[in-house]
Amino acid sequence: KSTSCMEAGSYCGSTTRICCGYCAYSASKNVCDYPSN
């Protein structure tokens, strides 16, 4: 199945699509980010 995910830098939250990486929470805003490896 094809999954639609949000790229890094996109706003993430309970009402948004799943991030391609993960949702990075901060005090000002929550944005999608990729794991650093």
Swiss-Prot record:
Chain residues in the propeptide: 1-4
Entry's localization field: Secreted
Disulfide bonds: 5-20, 12-23, 19-32
Keyword match Cell membrane: no
Sections of the chain in a coiled coil: none
The family this protein is said to belong to: Belongs to the conotoxin O1 superfamily.
Identification of the protein by name: Omega-conotoxin-like S6.7
Organism annotation: Conus striatus
